[in-house]
Regions:
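NAD(P)+-binding Rossmann beta1-loop-alpha1 motif at the extreme N-terminus of oxidoreductases
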Residues: 1-62, 88, 124
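Residues in the short beta-alpha loop(s) of Rossmann-like NAD(P)-binding domains
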Residues: 31-32, 66, 139
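Rossmann-like NAD(P)(H) cofactor-binding subdomain of soluble oxidoreductases
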Residues: 52-53, 59-62, 67-132
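Rossmann-fold dinucleotide-binding core
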Residues: 96-174, 178
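Active-site-proximal catalytic alpha-helix in oxidoreductases
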Residues: 129-137, 158, 162-194, 205-217, ...
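Interdomain hinge/lid region at the active-site interface
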Residues: 163, 167, 211-276
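NAD(P)-dependent dehydrogenase/reductase Rossmann-like domain
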Residues: 269-295
Length: 295
């Protein structure tokens, strides 16, 4: 089978590497030459900076930064769906809004292309290990076609339903993570201000009922003053906006989402958009005049 992969960034590159191990003919695309260089000389792998070269594949994977880029790549003038073979599969691993996924699905349906929204959950280490969670939306028969490929990149592969179901599932999961991160940012500077030992407090939080993936990831890094790791705050904020759009359109009250969004907005206004979500802690540290760090 011919496979193509577009988008060789922090997540895309290790995912494509795992697909390359499967032995199928793989063509990888990126606009960045240095990203392509990682794949130069690999058996059964071709590299290209021209999207025309990836359109002969039966399955094309996308792993791109945002919905606007996905839509431009797939639907724009000279976009992929205008050049792909009828019946081929466009599988989008990117995290984009539910609305953007539905727009791409509609465009694909009009041109005879099978679309699957397949957002991934798990950070770079899991992408490298091939242990991602993949949530898939589209026709079940299309899912079955690409399921063997998805098993090369993840260990928890879930068919969630029709187009859009993958992105919606990812959003629900991501919201809980995002909200947890905002809650942590609010409480740990309070602990420091009130005289609690930060290391002991973090130990209690990560062994007690307050434990979460967010606390396990962000608290050790906060103690070291490391706020650069993890999903960029500006990208996480887009998840909150997507959820707010669904909340408004479906009349779903989400007061906790609204409160968390305000914390993200404060952090973005403070210039922390390129940092990880843990940098929200710095907002409240500055407000309270304290730091949650190792002694």
């Amino acid at each position: 089978m011919k496979i193509s992969f577009a988008g060789l960034g922090k997540m895309g590159a290790p995912i494509a590497m795992n697909l390359a191990k499967g032995g199928d003919e793989l063509t990888v695309f990126d606009i960045n030459e240095s990203n392509l260089a990682k794949f130069s000389g690999l058996k059964n792998v071709k590299t290209t900076g021209n999207t025309d070269d990836i359109c002969e594949a039966g399955v094309i994977f996308l792993c791109l930064p945002n919905g606007d880029i996905v839509k431009k790549t797939a639907l724009g003038p000279n976009g992929l769906i205008s050049k792909m073979k009828k019946g081929a599969v466009l599988a989008d691993l990117s995290t984009i809004s539910w609305k953007a996924a539905m727009d791409v699905a509609e465009g694909c349906a009009e041109t005879g292309i099978e679309f699957m929204d397949c957002p991934i959950s798990g950070m770079e280490a899991r992408a490298i290990a091939g242990t991602l969670t993949v949530m898939c939306g589209g026709k079940e028969e299309t899912f079955r076609r690409i399921e063997p490929l998805l098993k090369m990149i993840g260990t928890n592969i879930l068919y969630m339903g029709k187009n859009g179901a993958g992105q919606l599932t990812k959003l629900i999961n991501q919201l809980l993570f995002d909200i947890n991160a905002a809650a942590i940012a609010e409480v740990v500077p309070m602990a420091a201000l009130m005289g609690l030992d930060p290391e002991k407090t973090a130990s209690v939080m990560n062994s007690g009922t307050g434990r979460s993936y967010a606390s396990e990831f962000f608290l050790p890094r906060a103690l070291e003053g490391n706020f650069s790791e993890g999903y960029a705050m500006k990208n996480a904020y887009k998840d909150l906006v997507s959820a707010a759009e669904i909340s408004a359109s479906q009349s779903i009250p989400m007061p906790v989402l609204a409160a968390a969004t305000a914390t993200y907005q404060q952090a973005l206004r403070s210039g922390y958009g390129e940092l990880g979500k843990g940098a929200m802690i710095k907002v409240f540290e500055k407000l309270l005049g304290t730091e949650f760090r190792k002694g």
